[in-house]
Amino acid sequence: MRSVIWFIVSYTLMLLVLRGGKEVEAEKLCTTIGDLDGKCSQDGEKLCMRYMTDQSKKKFLSCTCNNVVMLHKYKHYCECQSHCTPKQT
């Protein structure tokens, strides 16, 4: 008797799991780029996040900091990801 009940319960749960799954489209991410004077430090990503947030007034999910040389000077090259906002017409 117990095995029959367990079979019915497990079968019902399996059906719910298989039929209940919906496909969700991933939200697109947009990239924003900026640069600062100097080299990236240990907390370069945090510095980029603060700088880019202050400049664009957007909330960023993640930022990377890369050192580049422009006109014989080091620069922070900040590349930050945020959710894309729909264009308003």
From Swiss-Prot:
Family annotation (InterPro entries): SCRL
The keyword Signal is annotated on this UniProt entry: yes
One Pfam family in the UniProt entry: SCRL
Compartment(s) where it occurs, according to its Swiss-Prot or TrEMBL record: Secreted
Signal sequence residues: 1-26
Any Gene Ontology CC annotation: extracellular region
Cystines in this chain: C30-C84, C40-C65, C48-C78, C63-C80
GO BP term, pick one: defense response to fungus
Recorded superkingdom: Eukaryota
Entry annotated with the keyword Secreted: yes
Record key words, sorted: Antimicrobial, Disulfide bond, Fungicide, Plant defense, Secreted, Signal
Protein family according to the UniProt entry: Belongs to the DEFL family.
Name of this chain's protein: Putative defensin-like protein 230
Organism (species): Arabidopsis thaliana (Mouse-ear cress)
Annotated gene: SCRL24
